[in-house]
Amino acid sequence: MISCPACGQSCTTPPTNTITATEAAQAFVLKEEFPRQNHELMRLITELWRGNTCDIQQCQNCQLKFAWPFVAGSGEFYNLAYPYSDYPKQRWEWDQSIAALPGINLHGGPVLEIGSGFGYFLKKISPSHLPADRVVAIEYNDFSRNRLNESGFAALGEDIRSASFDSYHKQFSAVFMFQVLEHMDDIAGVVSRINHLCRPGASVFIAVPNHLRIDFNESHQSLIDMPPNHISRWTHAAFSHLGARVGWQMMDYRIEPMSWPAFIKQDLVYTHMRRAQRPGSLANVVRGRRRTRLRMILEGLAALSAAPLRIPSWLDAARSTGSLGGSSWVHFKTPSIR
């Protein structure tokens, strides 16, 4: 039986899409550029899925889209698919979370960020809102974790569901998860564990890719939101049902406003990357070259040359009834009495 990870309802409708391991591997690592890594990635994805295909299901109750099998990428997967770590220094959802901090009692206990990268967000709230020694960070990348520790944060390379966090029972006054939840499986176990680790009335801040933007991208020849990297796509209703299952109160929900310059730039890049996945295409030939400055120039020219073909899609974006900004953000409160 296929059950929705957000609301728990059974999903009986046919999948909205089916993706092969070959397609997934090509989306992450071009075989024309890195044939060995592409082959290894395809093998690994097949092992994760226990087969050659993955379905994309949509819950009719809360509209969550999710991969089935609902299996997250492993450390080995991310080492192959994303060998170079790159973290943004600023995100819209950070500002939303920081603006909410004055209404939160951060003196009650430490705070936790899951997926901290280099700690750019944490440096925005510490020491201005709390000292570094009251911040716990989860980060799997060894290099990033070392940088966090050097900044004075307690950085751990452990899953919150591990026994390493047992000592934090009812300790955290706030939890931050930015662009993390969509990568995780066992959602019920994750939120249940957060409840276990949080003080009564703690705040949980979550940001995920905007489902409206992803739907637009996929319906307009842009990048596919590809598993096993992203395995869930969150709507307002999905968040509401998830919160209700664990007694969380939704305090706020927002979608990032769209910036036209950022939208057009990303659209040109993403559609170029999508075309590059097709063997023999101009984008594929260019992107399959060795990484040099010349290749960067050729890629830029190839992406820009397709701009006139993107105008109908941009007009569709202008007519969209929902914001096509990059992120959705939600602020929950955990139960006051447990």
Spans of features found by a protein language model:
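A short glycine-rich, Lys/Arg-flanked "PGG" loop and its adjoining helix->strand segment in the class I
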Residues: 188-203
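Conserved N-terminal segment of class I S-adenosyl-L-methionine
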Residues: 1-178, 188-191, 254-256, 280, ...
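A short His-aromatic
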Residues: 179-183
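Short N-terminal helix/helix-N-cap motif within the alpha/beta-hydrolase-1
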Residues: 185-189, 216
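Rossmann-like AdoMet/SAM-dependent catalytic core
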Residues: 2, 252, 257, 271-331
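Hydrophobic/aromatic residues located in beta-strands of well-ordered beta-sheets
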Residues: 135, 204-206
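Short glycine/proline- and charge-enriched loop/turn segments
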Residues: 38, 79-86, 219-227, 266-273
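Short, glycine-/aromatic-enriched active-site segment of Class I SAM-dependent methyltransferases
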Residues: 21-32, 206-233, 237-243, 258
